[in-house]
C-alpha cells in the first residue's frame, strides 16, 4: 500500500564504504543488471500492472554505471508516458545535471538526498565523502530543472560528533533553500533526522551509541536553530525508539526472554509510533537483570568477543577494526569498484568480483574526495615447486 509503484531493482551491493551502513558492508560486491534488461523489466512491468510511477531501486541508484542512459531509454518507451520516475537513495555526488535533465521529462516527485552529516569533517569520519559543494551542485541541478521540493536526510549521534557538526545540518539546509530561491518563489526543504544506531558487521560496531538524553539535546538544538528559517521543515525520529533499536541491534541470546515478555505484555506493532511503549522494554530488561548501557551505550575494545563473531558476511574483522581506527583519524576510503582492492574479504574470500553494466564510472565520480588512508593490507604469497623444473616456462616464471 505504501509503495504503490513499480519497483525495479537495478543493482545489488554497494562499495562506497559508508561506515554506518550495514547493508553496504554485508551485500558486497556490486552486481549491476544489464541496461537492456532493466528497460525491458520497466516496459513489461508497466504494461502488466497499470502503475504510473517507476522506482529504480538499489542502495545508491545514481551510482549505476551509465544511469543517464538507463533513464533516457526508460523515458523514451511509449509505455512510460506519462510516468513519474524516482531514484531512491540518491548520493549528491552522483546526481548530475544530465541525470536531472533526463528525469525532468517525467512527472516530478520530490527528491531526497542523504548527506548524513552536517560537516565535511564528520562526513570523512563516516566515509560519506561528499563535499558541501557536491550537495549544492546537486540541488542546483534539481531546482534548475523544475523541482521545488527537496528532502535532506541526516544522522545525529555519529562518532566524534560535536555541536558544530549538528548545527551544520541547519546551515546546509538554509544554503540549499537559498539556491532554491534563485529558481522558485517558494522552494521547500525538509530535513529528516534519525538517531544513529551502530550495526554489527560495520566499522562502527565498537562505538557506544548516544543516550536518549543526548539525542534529545541535539534534536532541541536543531529545532531551535531551524524554527526561524522560512521554507525549512524539520522532522526527527523518536529518540526513545532509537534506544530500543540500539538494544536489538547489538543484542545477544539474553534478549530472547525480553522479547517474549514485551509481547506478552501487549507489545505488538512496536514499530508504529502510536503503539510504541518504551516502558515495556525497560521493564522487561529490568526483570531479566539486563542493563541498556551494556548493550547500547558502552564502547567495545578490539579484543572483545562480539555476539555475532561466529557469523560472517565475508568482511574480515581486522579490516573493520582498521577502518574504525581510520574513521577516528578522519580518513576515507574510495569506492573499490574503480580503485585497487582493499582486501576487505567480501570478494577475495569467495572468489567473486564486481559485475558492472559499464566499464565507465558514473559521471558524478563515485570516487570519493576525502583524505585517503595510507594503511595497506599485507598479503603473503607462497610459491612452491611441485613438479620437475624442466617443465616450467621462462615466461610463466617471469609473470
Where would I find each of the regions flagged by the language model?
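Flexible glycine/acidic-rich beta-alpha junction loops that bind and position SAM and/or redox cofactors
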Residues: 16, 65-66, 95-99, 121-126, ...
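Glycine- and acidic
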Residues: 3-8, 19-29, 51-59, 118-125, ...
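Two-metal-ion acidic nuclease core segments, chiefly of the RNase H-like superfamily
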Residues: 216-226
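Conserved SAM/AdoMet-binding glycine-rich loop
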Residues: 44-194, 198
Amino acid at each position: 500500500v505504501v509503495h504503490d509503484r513499480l519497483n525495479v531493482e537495478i543493482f545489488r551491493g554497494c562499495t562506497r564504504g559508508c561506515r554506518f551502513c550495514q547493508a553496504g558492508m554485508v551485500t558486497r560486491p556490486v552486481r549491476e543488471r544489464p541496461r537492456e534488461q532493466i528497460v525491458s523489466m520497466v516496459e513489461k512491468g508497466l504494461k502488466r500492472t497499470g502503475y504510473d510511477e517507476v522506482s529504480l531501486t538499489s542502495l545508491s541508484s545514481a551510482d549505476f554505471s551509465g544511469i543517464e542512459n538507463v533513464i533516457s531509454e526508460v523515458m523514451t518507451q511509449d509505455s512510460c508516458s506519462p510516468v513519474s520516475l524516482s531514484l531512491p537513495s540518491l548520493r549528491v555526488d552522483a546526481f548530475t545535471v544530465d541525470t536531472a535533465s533526463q528525469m525532468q521529462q517525467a512527472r516530478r516527485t520530490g527528491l531526497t538526498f542523504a548527506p548524513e552529516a552536517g560537516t565535511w569533517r564528520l562526513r570523512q569520519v563516516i566515509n560519506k565523502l561528499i563535499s558541501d559543494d557536491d550537495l549544492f551542485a546537486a540541488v542546483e541541478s534539481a531546482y534548475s530543472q523544475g523541482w521545488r521540493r527537496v528532502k535532506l536526510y541526516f544522522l545525529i549521534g555519529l562518532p566524534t560528533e560535536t555541536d558544530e557538526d549538528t548545527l551544520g545540518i541547519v546551515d546546509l539546509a538554509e544554503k540549499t533553500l537559498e539556491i532554491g530561491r534563485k529558481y522558485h518563489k517558494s522552494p521547500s526543504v525538509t530535513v529528516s533526522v534519525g538517531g544513529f544506531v551502530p550495526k554489527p558487521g560495520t566499522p562502527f560496531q565498537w562505538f557506544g551509541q548516544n543516550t536518549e538524553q543526548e539525542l534529545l539535546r541535539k534534536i532541541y538544538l536543531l529545532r531551535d536553530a531551524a524554527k526561524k528559517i522560512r521554507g525549512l521543515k524539520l522532522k526527527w525520529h523518536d529518540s526513545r525508539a532509537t534506544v530500543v533499536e540500539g538494544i536489538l541491534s547489538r543484542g545477544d541470546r539474553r534478549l530472547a526472554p525480553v522479547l517474549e515478555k514485551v509481547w506478552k505484555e501487549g507489545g505488538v506493532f512496536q514499530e508504529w509510533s502510536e503503539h510504541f511503549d518504551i516502558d515495556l522494554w525497560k521493564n522487561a530488561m529490568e526483570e531479566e537483570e539486563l542493563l541498556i548501557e551494556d548493550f547500547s551505550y558502552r564502547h567495545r575494545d578490539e579484543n572483545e568477543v562480539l555476539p555475532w563473531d561466529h557469523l560472517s558476511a565475508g568482511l574480515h574483522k581486522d579490516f573493520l577494526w582498521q577502518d574504525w581506527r581510520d574513521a577516528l583519524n578522519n580518513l576515507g576510503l574510495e569506492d573499490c569498484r574503480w580503485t585497487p582492492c582493499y582486501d576487505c574479504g567480501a570478494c577475495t574470500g569467495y572468489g567473486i568480483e564486481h559485475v558492472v553494466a559499464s566499464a565507465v564510472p558514473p559521471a558524478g565520480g563515485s570516487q570519493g574526495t576525502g583524505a585517503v588512508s595510507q594503511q595497506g593490507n599485507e598479503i603473503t604469497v607462497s610459491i612452491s615447486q611441485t613438479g620437475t623444473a624442466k617443465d616450467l616456462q621462462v615466461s610463466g616464471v617471469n609473470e
